[in-house]
């Protein structure tokens, strides 16, 4: 197998008394999508910031395209693109002006800047808004121009930190299609997300991080397969019902709870469902809902972290990362496109 396009090996990073990363390791092969999953504060953004030269690790190794990012940060920045939760383009410039600015900062010839700007504005359906100030753009348009800016210099590696946070379903689906097209053309993508459907659709491999440690990794199919072939989902009107049902059904399989609902992972769905109904009836418990279905990444996330995925919101870490990126671009010290 060829060398990975992205490599993190035993990364350690502390902030005061907080251990953000505790020996995190993962890799992404060329032309694939690696999804980093985890709750807020798990360490996903910290790992991404190290790989994109915005933070130095306390220990460990981080490489992009075989280059140690701490030894050659400027070269690394010229070979990657970065788009975060919040669009980092200049709101007081037009869409086209933002793309031209990134082109100049990454030292592209004038003709190439125009060619790339034309192509990206068309690709992201922004030609009709190219001369409007970005501050007049909708949330979906801002996310698209931000991603376009990250692609001006044709980076072979793209880092996306919660790229669809705050987007409506249609805009999210459109952006997924764009990412899929980039990967089909050979781009390597590292994607952090809490949208489990997003990881299920896009990621070739998934790494789950919690409390600064890798707690699971594999394909979506492999991760879901660890739970068993079927999930029985039971809902009650209160937490007391969940607690009583858990006592009755723990013998049937692995149980995870979430508020007024619990999920039972089993290998023989039909037999386990029959046993579930009998046990609930014997305990005089009447659930509001009872369903039998295939496991999802949400079940995996709940089983591994102890709670369901949160609604993604922009984090302070991400704001700091993008601010640092802007400083680098405007001072001419780097070419991270955000």
Model features per residue range: what roles?
Residues 3-8, 13-210, 216:
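ABC transporter nucleotide-binding domains
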Residues 20, 198, 241, 272, ...:
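Short phosphate-engaging motifs
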Residues 67-70, 131, 214, 239, ...:
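Short, surface-exposed acidic/glycine-rich loop or hinge patches that mediate macromolecular interfaces
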Residues 78, 228-232, 286:
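A generic structural signal for short beta-strands and their flanking turns/coil linkers
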Residues 107, 232, 254, 285, ...:
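Non-catalytic alpha-helical coupling and interface elements of nucleotide-dependent molecular machines
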Residues 176-267, 291:
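ABC transporter nucleotide-binding domain
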Residues 269-338:
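C-terminal coupling/interaction segments
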């Amino acid at each position: 197998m060829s060398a990975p396009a992205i490599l993190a090996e035993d990364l350690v990073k502390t902030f005061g008394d907080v251990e953000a990363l505790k020996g995190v390791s993962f890799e992404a092969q060329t032309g694939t999508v690696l999804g980093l999953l985890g709750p807020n504060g798990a360490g996903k953004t910290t790992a991404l910031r190290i790989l994109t030269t915005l933070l130095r690790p306390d220990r460990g190794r981080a490489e992009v395209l075989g280059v140690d990012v701490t030894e050659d940060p400027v070269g690394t920045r010229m070979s990657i693109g970065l788009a975060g939760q919040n669009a980092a383009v200049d709101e007081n410039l037009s869409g086209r002006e933002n793309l031209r600015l990134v082109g100049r900062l990454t030292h592209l010839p004038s003709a190439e800047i125009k060619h790339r700007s034309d192509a990206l504005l068309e690709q992201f359906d922004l030609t009709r808004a190219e001369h409007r100030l970005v501050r007049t753009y909708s949330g979906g348009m801002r996310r698209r121009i931000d991603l376009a800016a990250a692609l001006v210099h044709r980076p072979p590696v793209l880092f996306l930190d919660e790229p669809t946070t705050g987007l409506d379903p249609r805009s999210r689906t459109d952006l997924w299609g764009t990412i899929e097209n980039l990967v089909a053309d050979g781009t390597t993508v590292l994607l952090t997300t809490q949208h489990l459907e997003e990881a299920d659709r896009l990621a070739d491999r998934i790494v789950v991080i919690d409390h600064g440690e890798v707690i699971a990794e594999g394909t979506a199919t492999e991760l879901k397969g660890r739970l068993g072939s079927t999930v029985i989902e039971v809902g009650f009107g209160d937490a007391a019902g969940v607690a009583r049902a858990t006592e009755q059904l723990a013998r049937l399989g692995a149980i995870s709870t979430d508020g007024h609902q619990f999920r039972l992972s089993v290998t023989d769905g039909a037999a386990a469902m029959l046993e579930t109904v009998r046990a609930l009836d014997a305990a005089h418990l009447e659930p509001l809902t009872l369903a039998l279905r295939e496991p999802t990444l949400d079940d995996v996330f709940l089983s591994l972290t102890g709670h369901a995925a949160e609604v993604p919101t922009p984090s302070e870490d991400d704001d700091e990362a993008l601010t640092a990126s802007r400083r680098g671009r405007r001072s001419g010290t780097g070419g991270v496109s955000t």
